[in-house]
């Protein structure tokens, strides 16, 4: 595990010691090298886990998320160059250091083999994210967004700490590898119901569950581009990962406790998709679409069948790359037009034809067009939820239709129509931006050729 963690730590001195004109090039190329190392973890030759040390392990659930995390750092650096071009040098270096620190915490969170260690790192990811949002965001509302983000996450995860200490007290260990062999069924008592809620709430807030999702659109809209990318792509996946890890402890209570949360997710999925249809703000639309996709993952994890777990893992990876790409596209519009309102950015296809192609591809992957892995994940989730209850097929069908509607609405509003006069002399798309979009789309297309490497622990 150290062969990823130590190079990531060494990125920080690299940032501070590079020449001013070489900072971006050095950190990006080095970050890409680290992400290539992490691809080795995707090859899981045997059924049991890779125990790198007492603290770190990697299995077929954490490996895809680990690869996604390392892959995203160079992409964030590529996307942030324009945003930081006017900043003084030290502030640029601080920003890059924050991103590297966040990546370090995320890598360690996904590979921690002990639940308390996992919890500490899960909370540590909050600090760099908060600094990135509140220091480099665009509007003054970013402070409000940071407060929302901080308090929602902390209020959700403090009960988890108490619950973990309680579990540790009567189990004697919180190591993932030990827990598997100690599973005693939790009976339906009030104390166990509260234990279940305390364990799940932290991850439900992080996912976010409909009703606890108010921090997400705020944080996404106010964050700078790298903040939005890492929030959508990796931080939401922490919730799904934590849920998949901790549900094994809480059986058979989950079967009994999952109903209200399933209902809330299925209802919230349709509600947030419908909210997307009446958004004027581009970033806000993409943020709400993330909530609706993550609701599918919550449903899948709570059903607890092998198929639904496979669907949840595939959907998490697919959504990470897709939403990150959409945020990059929204940002490239914002850098030219200086507004997130979609109506002001209409008719861009005539001015930026290549960008329009990227918009089309990103929208199609977002609405889960075959043969992308978004479709594979959604199919698994839809099929497993149908076998859990037949009624869900109606809700899932409505959701898929609305998803297609808002994806195409986003595409048509920004790309078609007559462009307004204030955007006649905008800059053309840079090679950097085209490379960025390619690096988002390439993994999505390549994974559709061999989806089994991201189907998680069951496959």
UniProtKB/Swiss-Prot annotation:
Enzyme type, top EC level: translocase
GO process annotations (BP)? aerobic respiration; electron transport coupled proton transport; mitochondrial electron transport, NADH to ubiquinone; mitochondrial respiratory chain complex I assembly
Cite the Pfam families for this sequence. Oxidored_q5_N (PF01059), Proton_antipo_M (PF00361)
Report which reactions are catalysed by this protein.
a ubiquinone + NADH + 5 H(+)(in) = a ubiquinol + NAD(+) + 4 H(+)(out)
Report the transmembrane regions from the record: 22-42, 60-80, 93-113, 114-134, 147-167, 193-213, 224-244, 256-276, 284-303, 308-330, 351-371, 391-411, 435-455
Asked if the Swiss-Prot or TrEMBL record annotates the protein with the keyword Transport, the reply is yes
Q: Which InterPro entries match?
A: NADH4_N, NADH_Q_OxRdtase_chainM/4, NADH_UbQ_OxRdtase, ND/Mrp_TM
Task: State its location(s).
Answer: Mitochondrion inner membrane
Keywords, ordered alphabetically: Electron transport, Membrane, Mitochondrion, Mitochondrion inner membrane, NAD, Respiratory chain, Translocase, Transmembrane, Transmembrane helix, Transport, Ubiquinone
Q: Which family does it belong to?
A: Belongs to the complex I subunit 4 family.
> Quaternary arrangement and interactors, per the entry?
Core subunit of respiratory chain NADH dehydrogenase (Complex I) which is composed of 45 different subunits.
This chain belongs to the protein called NADH-ubiquinone oxidoreductase chain 4
Species this chain originates from: Canis lupus familiaris
Q: What is the lineage of its organism?
A: Eukaryota, Metazoa, Chordata, Craniata, Vertebrata
- Point out the gene that encodes the protein: MT-ND4
């Amino acid at each position: 595990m150290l062969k990823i963690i130590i190079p990531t730590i060494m990125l920080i001195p690299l940032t501070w010691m590079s020449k001013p004109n070489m900072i971006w090039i050095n950190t990006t190329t080095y970050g890409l090298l680290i992400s290539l190392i992490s691809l080795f973890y995707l090859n899981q030759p045997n059924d049991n886990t890779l125990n790198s040390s007492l603290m770190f392990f990697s299995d077929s659930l954490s490996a895809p998320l680990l690869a996604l995390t390392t892959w995203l750092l160079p992409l964030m650096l590529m996307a942030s160059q324009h945003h930081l071009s006017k900043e003084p040098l030290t502030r640029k270096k601080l920003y890059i250091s924050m991103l590297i620190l966040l990546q370090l915490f995320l890598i360690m969170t996904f590979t921690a083999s002990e639940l308390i260690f996992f919890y500490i790192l899960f909370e540590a990811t909050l600090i760099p994210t908060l600094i990135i949002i509140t220091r480099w965001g665009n509007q003054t509302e970013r402070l409000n967004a940071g407060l929302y983000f901080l308090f929602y996450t902390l209020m959700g995860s403090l009960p988890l700490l108490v619950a973990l200490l309680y579990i540790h007290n009567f189990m004697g260990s919180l190591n993932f590898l030990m827990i598997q062999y100690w599973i005693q069924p939790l009976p339906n008592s009030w104390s166990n119901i509260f234990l279940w809620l305390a364990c799940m709430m932290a991850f439900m807030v992080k996912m976010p569950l409909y009703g606890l999702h108010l921090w997400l659109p705020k944080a996404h809209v106010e964050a700078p581009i790298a903040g939005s990318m890492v929030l959508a792509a990796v931080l939401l996946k922490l919730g799904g990962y934590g849920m998949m890890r901790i549900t094994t402890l809480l059986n058979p209570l989950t079967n009994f406790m999952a109903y209200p949360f399933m209902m809330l997710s299925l209802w919230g999925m349709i509600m947030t998709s419908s909210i997307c249809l009446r958004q004027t703000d581009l970033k806000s639309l993409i943020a709400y679409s993330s909530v609706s996709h993550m609701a599918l993952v919550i449903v899948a994890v709570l059903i607890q069948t092998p198929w639904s777990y496979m669907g949840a893992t595939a959907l998490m990876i697919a959504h990470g790359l897709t939403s990150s790409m959409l945020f990059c596209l929204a940002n490239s519009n914002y850098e030219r037009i200086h507004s997130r309102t979609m109506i002001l950015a209409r008719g861009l296809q005539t001015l930026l034809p290549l960008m329009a192609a990227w918009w089309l591809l990103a929208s199609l992957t977002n609405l889960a067009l075959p043969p992308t892995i978004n479709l594979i994940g959604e199919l698994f989730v839809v099929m497993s939820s149908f076998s859990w209850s037949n009624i869900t097929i109606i809700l899932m069908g409505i959701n898929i239709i609305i998803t297609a509607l808002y994806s195409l609405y986003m595409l048509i509003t920004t790309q078609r129509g007559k462009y307004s006069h204030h955007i006649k002399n905008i800059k053309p798309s840079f090679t950097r931006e085209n490379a960025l979009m390619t690096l988002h789309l390439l993994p999505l297309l390549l994974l559709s050729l061999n989806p089994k490497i991201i189907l998680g622990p069951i496959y």
